[in-house]
């Protein structure tokens, strides 16, 4: 049922309730029955109102139905209504109401499922990897989730900025530099004098080789960095290695089809004095104290749910990792992004309350800023066994490995199809299979099958566009029409909950409904009018499948 139709039906039900219970304030909710035989849409409004009104719920439901069906507008939407169980009202739509989605999709095309611009802006930060190695499968899940959430925000009318925060300051960067230095001097990772916390992947050898060759590298948002070849200068090695890996990560993201609007460097917060300013402000406002030679933030007093106070400056000097995060999010707020979303691994759960506490102490920024989507681990399986190691990365499967093995469409869909807060097993064999069990193949095949069907039909686009949808009355056609009408509400729900898996589920279900219809009803029948009507339903399905796939960053192929 189209959203506009739902709004109209809710208004009509409220008017019917007012006739039965003039004093009642009806909060009408509609839902799709779990069993198709029970109708197209249902409400429990009679059950909600019966007890306070001291009425029998079934009798009240019947009164609401009688008052509703006396309205001419209701009869245009509702074919019949029945009372079920303790007082549910189940509605069946008129054929015209069911078929209205075809014209809605035809008139809106790519915009079907999208909302008008709302004048709001949001910053979504994701991937945000340390520039110390190739992007891994966890980063791939962030990339898939983050880009899909950005696309959902855009479809919901928001002005979206994609941002990548580089953790380019701290011990991990020093460990990168000494690792490259060691490999440049011919020290192998298994040698006793190799740095204890050094990185061991083959990519370290590649960096050392290019540093010795005095090559130049350039990240997408930076200036070229030319290697000096001086293995005694850790500063030179550090600058080249960071630029090298940032470029490598850029290439991984390009292979994934992902472009960021902005890159923000952690080091810039130190260089600009924003980290020190953050600490000084929290001290001046009385939100800190000294103990054991360390500086502590009174997070337990700042109302964000932290269970103990947190160290900001360690006793041996240097700030803990959440301090620059507080400074960074203060900068986000000052840039005018009062809506911000961070997509991070679930191992960052402990930082949420700390960052929000720091922001409360700094400027009284709302306690729910920023919003977080925390995702769990990805396990990669192949041939029934877990894949743990990539030769190039040394200790983990990379994002590029996944893309090379199964293609970016499968990577994106598979990493989105489950709730972010659940662990996910990425089955390489399943992602490569050409079967109904592979959801991305199943969905893309539905789109390609429609393209082939229309191409072989001999009908022109104009003939299909003018077909009479009143002929679409088969049960499988009604089921498919109902699914297509749900799409805008699914998009809105996915955006509201920051949960793109809702779209992935819908796409799978829509493909299933299409294949069921295709197998139940011949499309290219001898009767010209019916043939064109069914081709029009197929074309409508193709459009909405393409719209849904686009929200996930997945292609809609014409041929497979």
From Swiss-Prot:
What is the scientific name of the source organism?
Bordetella pertussis (strain Tohama I / ATCC BAA-589 / NCTC 13251)
- GO molecular function per UniProt: arginine-tRNA ligase activity; ATP binding
Keyword Acyltransferase on this protein? no
EC number(s): the record gives 6.1.1.19
- Subcellular compartments: Cytoplasm
* GO terms for biological process, alphabetical: arginyl-tRNA aminoacylation
The record's section on InterPro entries has: aa-tRNA-synth_I_CS (IPR001412), Arg-tRNA-ligase (IPR001278), Arg-tRNA-synth_N (IPR005148), Arg-tRNA-synth_N_sf (IPR036695), ArgRS_core (IPR035684), DALR_anticod-bd (IPR008909), Rossmann-like_a/b/a_fold (IPR014729), tRNAsynth_Ia_anticodon-bd (IPR009080)
What name appears for this protein in its UniProt entry? Arginine--tRNA ligase
């Amino acid at each position: 049922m189209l959203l506009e139709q739902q709004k109209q039906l809710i208004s009509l039900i409220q008017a019917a309730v007012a006739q039965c219970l003039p004093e009642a304030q009806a909060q009408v909710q509609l839902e799709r029955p779990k069993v198709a035989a029970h109708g197209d849409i249902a409400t429990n409004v009679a059950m909600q109102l019966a007890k306070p009104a001291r009425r029998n719920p079934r009798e009240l439901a019947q009164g609401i139905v009688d008052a509703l069906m006396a309205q001419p507008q209701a009869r245009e939407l509702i074919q019949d209504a029945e009372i079920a169980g303790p007082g549910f009202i189940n509605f069946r739509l008129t054929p015209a109401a069911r078929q209205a989605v075809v014209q809605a999709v035809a008139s809106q095309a790519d915009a079907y499922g999208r909302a008008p611009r709302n004048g709001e802006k949001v910053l979504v930060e994701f991937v945000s990897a340390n520039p110390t190695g190739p992007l891994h499968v966890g980063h791939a899940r962030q990339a898939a989730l983050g880009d899909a959430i950005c696309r959902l925000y855009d479809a919901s009318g928001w002005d979206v900025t994609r941002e990548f925060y580089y953790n380019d300051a701290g011990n991990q960067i020093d460990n990168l530099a000494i690792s490259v230095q060691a490999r440049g001097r011919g020290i192998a990772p298994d040698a006793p004098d190799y740095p204890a916390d050094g990185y061991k992947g083959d990519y370290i050898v590649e960096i050392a080789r290019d540093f010795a060759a005095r090559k130049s590298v350039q990240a997408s948002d930076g200036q070229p960095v030319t290697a000096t070849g001086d293995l005694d200068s850790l500063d030179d090695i550090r600058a080249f290695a960071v630029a090298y890996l940032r470029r490598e990560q850029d290439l991984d993201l390009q292979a994934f089809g992902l472009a960021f609007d902005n890159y923000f460097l952690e080091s810039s917060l130190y260089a600009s004095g924003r980290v020190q300013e953050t600490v000084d402000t929290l001290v001046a406002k009385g939100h800190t104290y000294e103990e054991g030679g360390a500086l502590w933030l009174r997070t337990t007093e700042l109302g964000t749910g932290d269970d103990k106070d947190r160290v900001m400056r360690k006793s041996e000097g240097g700030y803990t990792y959440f301090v620059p995060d507080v400074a960074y999010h203060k900068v986000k707020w000052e840039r005018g992004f009062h809506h911000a979303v961070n997509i991070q691994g679930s191992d960052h759960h402990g930082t949420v309350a700390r960052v929000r506490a720091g922001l409360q102490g700094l400027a009284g920024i709302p306690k729910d800023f920023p919003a977080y989507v925390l995702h769990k681990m990805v396990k990669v399986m192949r041939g029934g066994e877990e894949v743990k190691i990539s030769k190039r990365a040394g200790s983990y499967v990379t994002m590029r490995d996944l893309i090379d093995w199964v293609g970016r469409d499968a990577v994106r869909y598979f990493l989105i199809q489950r709730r972010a807060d659940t662990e996910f097993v990425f089955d390489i064999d399943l992602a490569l299979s050409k079967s109904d069990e592979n959801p991305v193949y199943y969905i893309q095949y539905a789109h390609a099958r429609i393209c082939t069907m229309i191409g072989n039909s001999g009908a022109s686009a104009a003939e299909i566009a003018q077909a009479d949808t009143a002929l679409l009355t088969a049960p499988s056609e009604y089921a498919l029409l109902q699914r297509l009408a749900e799409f805008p509400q699914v998009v809105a729900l996915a955006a509201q909950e920051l949960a793109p898996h809702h779209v992935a589920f819908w796409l799978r279900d829509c493909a299933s409904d299409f294949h069921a219809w295709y197998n139940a009803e011949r499309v290219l029948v001898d009767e010209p009018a019916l043939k064109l009507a069914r081709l029009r339903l197929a074309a409508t399905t193709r459009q909405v499948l393409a719209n849904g796939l686009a929200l996930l960053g997945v292609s809609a192929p014409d041929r497979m």
